């Protein structure tokens, strides 16, 4: 990569990671925080608050990508990050679960993921695009792992509303990064591997292999959100740790997960066994869910 390509990749990966950090930081603590709200929300409402961003993000991903082809990548990123910041502030000021749900939905409405990947494609050559996308993907994983540890610690300092405020402020700072650090593309054009193609939507929806993968992603994220509705309470009951101390559970779990994941990825790549490793990972997740079902009594 040239220095300009590397700068573009790292700066855009940081924007992507920061946005996901704002989504993930509340996961390990929100369910317990929600139980202290005056309206005593149900598990369904808590789950909706956690996952509302995904609903609006899914709906607006294509429109944002299409708009970026017409109005430019950076203007749409500014708009998306601005919407995300507004959603963070709405959630921070919310006095009940409905307000948090609205805030989270607004956060998701700043659906800049497709725009960011399109801008990465504009700023990198074809032979380096895979590395750039992999860097962004790695940033998402790091943001999730970091959130599990940092969320409880930040909660002790500033509480959930404070975390939402912090997310909003950092998002506004990210706009400055896009403006002054991310290079301006010489031209923005369609990339078959990174840009939205509405005309091919029906072809995608009819592709059974893609549908299987899409369902797998949906199931993974649905299970992830559902787990964080109950796991914080389960940790409280089994370990008697305060929610601010839950990082003591999450940190070793994250470290062990990375240690187990890396050899699997290396083996899959070197031996061309990606599907087998993928299926094995699903089996491990299924086993873990069954264990949770018999061990969590909350």
Label the model's feature ranges:
Residues 28-43, 229-245:
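Short amphipathic helix-loop junctions that connect adjacent transmembrane helices
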Residues 70-80, 269-282:
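Cytoplasmic membrane-interface "Motif A"-like loop-to-helix N-cap segments
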Residues 169-188:
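C-terminal membrane-cytosol helix-exit motif in multi-pass small-molecule transporters
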Residues 103-141:
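Cytoplasmic helix-loop-helix junction between adjacent transmembrane helices
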